[in-house]
């Protein structure tokens, strides 16, 4: 019973989706169906966020340079330093490609949709999350290949205009259209916040099912033994824990408020599976891609589950803080 109190309904749903993808992955004609459905859900998510946020909130979020600077440092400085130290240390005797895979993971940009969705679920600064996560993803398309070439001796990597266009089309365009639609649908969105929250959660579940289905179809459970798999899980948990603790410490050290702390935690601790796998296809030989992205695929699932728990905890804290503020205002 204690486990069920720790794992809230959404986290349990996440685990169920992972198990569903493990036993019943999307195959054949269902693959493009779920890919298109996921794309549509993400576009709807950003459309609704655009409609929900006021012009003042967006301007304030975009101008929050201290927050954006730290998120970029967490993504492109803290993570790579940890990856280099870990690959140099090699504490366990496993396939060297797994160490290279973790190093590659640490170089990647932040994931966008889940970072923003979790920020929204937790009551964080969504406007800043949209700006910070989108900027990280766009910058990573050019910066990550350069870092790969620098620390992994892989050359010939460059930014993809197609990837930039995809981010603009799937994320920023729906957000802008939603915001432009705010005069007509803004009141409806404000009255249906619970439905908007369901959109956040549904988009995350679809991303998890689609990503894990692809991993299962590609033989994720046959590529490594149980010992190596346990190694990946433990290292992923330790790496994620270090980054989250550092982000929380720095957010409080730099005197960010609770909403900004939430944004920093969720935007500064994520790594993008959506960018990482296509980029690996360009940067590495086909024969090693599976092993290179295996740590990323497992880390991706762990970060979603851990952040689901954190989002619920932050949400309770945010609701308690709001209740205290409202109570103080009534007494005044």
From Swiss-Prot:
The gene is yfeH. This is Putative symporter YfeH. The keyword Cell membrane does not apply. Pfam families: SBF_like (PF13593). InterPro entries: Na+/solute_symporter_sf, Put_Na-Bile_cotransptr. One of its GO terms (molecular function) is symporter activity. Gene3D superfamilies: 1.20.1530.20. Keywords: Symport, Transport.
